[in-house]
Amino acid sequence: MRPVLPQKKINYKLLILYGLIFVICILGIGMSMYMQYFQDEKIGVIFGITDSEDEDLYNELKNNFSSLFTNDLDNSQGKDLEVKKIKEDFDIVATRHTYKEEQENYTLDVSIPIININNEEIKTYNQEIEDTYKQKVDEIKASSGYIYNVRYKCYIQDNILSLVIYSELKEKTSNQKIMIETFNYNLAENKEVTLEEILNLKNIKVSDANSKIKNEIKEIQEKNDSLTELGYNMYKRDVDSDIYEVPNIEQYFIGKDGNVYVIFAYGNYDQTSEMDVVIFMNK
């Protein structure tokens, strides 16, 4: 008589577990293949989340950059700052000189700021502002054929004071120049702040910042190259220049809502109004 073996019970829990593992593997492989062939797509789109609103806001901030300069202070920290002022009845940043003249030989619309903090480093910077902008006003008044506009904006975010000075200069028949100067100062530590320190404060890696800047500059130059081929006279950027590396960037500031602005004002050293603005939006 042939022995009868007992029937094994089917382990449905184990089958379900294997099935789930199989499905997860298939999804993982599918996602990897998708990212391989569509790596330029945003991950948010894959999950039904788009960044179109952020992109619209980003472009709006860039397009409205020149309208920021209203000759005043935007202090997001309220009155919780303790600084030793030069003049107690003035704000931390105020207008030191104002020139609004329209003469036959020149036109001036100039507001020159002063940082109202009593320490040696700030005094040195205030003197630089005086030497740069007031001296230019004096030169223009003794000359002819000039249009000179100077405006500023100051922000205080995270104990960092950021002063930005925007100037436009039209000399006779030459092209207009647009120039930007910035000054960033840690009010709590009484020292100037580097761009790298600001990026660290915002948890932005320097390598990521470099990549973003390079990509945006490259995209702008590619568009300019296309327009140049059509016969337009476009400003040429050297996309491989080290001026686009974080350690070498001179003009930057923390603006409204904690957004970090990086500015390449080519008029600072060329006869041009061309300027690039790269913004790291605060999340």
Regions found by a protein language model. Give the residues of each.
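Compositionally biased intrinsically disordered regions enriched in Thr/Gly
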Residues: 2-6, 10-22, 27-283
